[in-house]
Amino acid sequence: YEIGVRLVGSEMCIRDRVKIDNAAPFKISFNSPSDSIVTLATALNDTVHTVTIMNAIEAFHRQPEFKGFLLDKGKNLVSPPNLPQRKIEFIGNSITCGYGIESVEASDPFTEETENHYYTYAAITARNLHAQHFAIARSGIGIYRNYNGPREGSPDCMPAMYYQTLFNDSSEIWDFSRYIPDVVCINLGTNDTSTPGYDTDSLYNAYLAFHKTVRNNYPKAKIVWLTGCMLHGESLSLVKNTLDRLSDTLHKAGDLEVYRFDMTPQTGELGYGASWHPSLCLLYTSPSPR
């Protein structure tokens, strides 16, 4: 989630990424079983400030709740700035989450401390295009087979979970009319093909079925299918060829708002994040468009 607010005052209290006015963003952490008050800033000039809060980690094991702001006595929120008109939805896996992006060692394990969605290709792209962005992502998830999953597929792959508001709660179904993107970017397939045992026909059929789901939700959106920067060799060729086939099939069927984009495979030249994931430095370079 991302929350933006404007307020009058000098002090405010609320693991999130915080940006105040034009200052560099910073991360705050809190871990409490009960409601917590976290101070975001003190000693600000007593004037209007713009504050943005972004959930920096994936909410697979946690259910973040924002209860509100505490302001100086007698101070209040003011009318917020208009949101950007452009809207993008990103659907993906750990690369989209920002898994290990602040780590400096490929051998590091996953920790919430080094995950940061703010520095992912998704968030950076949205900021550069002055767009709102909505991310639906979970580490290890696939289009039909999660990381090292069975050949026949995983019951909790992205198409099965896509309808849920929260990954860990199947009771609340998301209302897709609440956010209608102009562009949907889908980066799935890395986990499906990262280990042996995948089925190529199941991979293609899952891509096709999920595309129809997304198209049904957003009839006018441009849908962009991506290959991620962690794919290499046989897996990269397979996913590229499968997505090219998907795009061709959909174009011939009359869906002309389908596009392809391949990220440049990472080489280690710019370092790695945890578990060989992209580093913050790598994600500031430009992928190669097709």
Give residue spans per PLM region.
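Exposed low-complexity, polar/acidic, P/S/T/G-rich flexible segments that act as propeptides
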Residues: 56-87
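Structural recognition of the beta-strand scaffold that forms the well-ordered cores
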Residues: 89-90, 133-136, 182-187, 223-226, ...
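Short glycine-rich His-centered loop
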Residues: 85-113
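Short strand-turn-strand beta-turns centered on an Asx-Gly dipeptide
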Residues: 19-23
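Exposed aromatic-hydrophobic patches
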Residues: 36-42
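Conserved SGNH/GDSL esterase-like catalytic core that processes O-acyl groups on lipids
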Residues: 33-34, 45, 49, 56-64, ...
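Conserved small/polar residues in nucleotide/adenosyl-binding loops
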Residues: 1-3, 7-16, 284-289
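Extracellular serine-dependent O-acyl
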Residues: 222-229, 235-273, 286, 290
